[in-house]
Amino acid sequence: MKVEDFDFDLPEELIAQTPLLDRTSSRLMVLDKESGDIKDQHFTDIISYLNEGDALVLNDTRVLPARLHGIKDETGAHIEVLLLKQKEGNAWETLVKPAKRIRKGATITFGDGALKATCLEELEHGGRILEFSYEGIFYEVLEQLGEMPLPPYIKEQLADQDRYQTVYAKENGSAAAPTAGLHFTEDLLAKISAKGVEIIFVTLHVGLGTFRPVDVEDTANHKMHSEFYRLTEESAERINKIKVQGGKVVAVGTTSIRTLETIASRHDGKLVAESGWTEIFISPGYTFQAVDALITNFHLPKSTLIMLVSALSDRTKILAAYNHAVEQQYRFFSFGDAMFIH
């Protein structure tokens, strides 16, 4: 299929720049994936679509405050570092600006010297392997010195960094939030659980590749970025049992779908305890083996994520739903409203 086939017109003012005061006060568009019927609801109405014996699968990754501002020791030049992926030990793959100032062997100091870095290797496109030195626990140092790496389409400063974390975020490692989960509060999850819905967690660390535009004309030629995922034995067994008993598996976010479908596609539709790196690209024509329904935000035109949701329903129904969202002034992208495709 052509990437252009997934384009739609989006007025810039519909791109949500800040989160709503109350996580659950967002709107919810409900789309019947077979008929294309649309209902405009509130996010708290999601409870009425979840039944006893269903599974609600959430991604418990935690966003790192991965943007650091430091000084090049040799010259005093200001350097911005974005952590991308942990390598061996204290070495990280990073994106450095301006990259030309940091060559192999260069050193950078952050804060008052609580964190230092040495460049071990130069990569293309501004990438650098940096080895960090510090006292104490790295993630605690990062919490003190780092900033949240907000998506490029968000221009406003984030007043409360916790609003770019889900309330159940636990596993450090993401460069971006699994944004469908931002709508949930502990109270809403408790009400869902009290209805007999099983709350199950997976982990997928979201990479910055999630914001990278698709730069090919044909979707068949697109290569996905890789992201780390993990499913525990307990979670795998619980989901398998629910499927056998006829319950629905409802994924919260495209990251949860990518985790479950990566594993199910390798094991004849079964889920097993597994961790690794996935480059799964889900687009129309894909047959889902693990997931029945999806809670997700509204995605960018021509993105791999709008291709994924089109695979769960179909392209024409999704684009019709997106056009409806524009007409009804839904809020788009990371801090925007939600959609339930079932």
UniProtKB/Swiss-Prot annotation:
List GO terms (cellular component aspect).
cytoplasm
Superkingdom to which the source organism belongs: Bacteria
What is an annotated GO biological process for this record, any one?
Answer: queuosine biosynthetic process
Query: SUPFAM superfamilies from the xrefs?
Result: QueA-like
Gene3D superfamilies in the record: QueA-like
Any idea which UniProt keywords this protein has? Cytoplasm, Queuosine biosynthesis, S-adenosyl-L-methionine, Transferase
Q: Which GO terms describe its molecular function?
A: S-adenosylmethionine:tRNA ribosyltransferase-isomerase activity
- Enumerate the subcellular locations listed in this protein's record, separating them with semicolons: Cytoplasm
Q: Which reaction equations make up its catalytic activity?
A: 7-aminomethyl-7-carbaguanosine(34) in tRNA + S-adenosyl-L-methionine = epoxyqueuosine(34) in tRNA + adenine + L-methionine + 2 H(+)
Q: Cite the annotated pathway.
A: tRNA modification; tRNA-queuosine biosynthesis
- Which Enzyme Commission number(s) are on file for it? 2.4.99.17
Q: Does the keyword Translocase apply?
A: no
Q: What does the sequence similarity comment in the record state about its family? A: Belongs to the QueA family.
Q: Which PANTHER family match?
A: S-ADENOSYLMETHIONINE:TRNA RIBOSYLTRANSFERASE-ISOMERASE
Function in brief: Transfers and isomerizes the ribose moiety from AdoMet to the 7-aminomethyl group of 7-deazaguanine (preQ1-tRNA) to give epoxyqueuosine (oQ-tRNA).
Whom does it interact with, and what assembly results?
A: Monomer.
Write the protein's name. Answer: S-adenosylmethionine:tRNA ribosyltransferase-isomerase
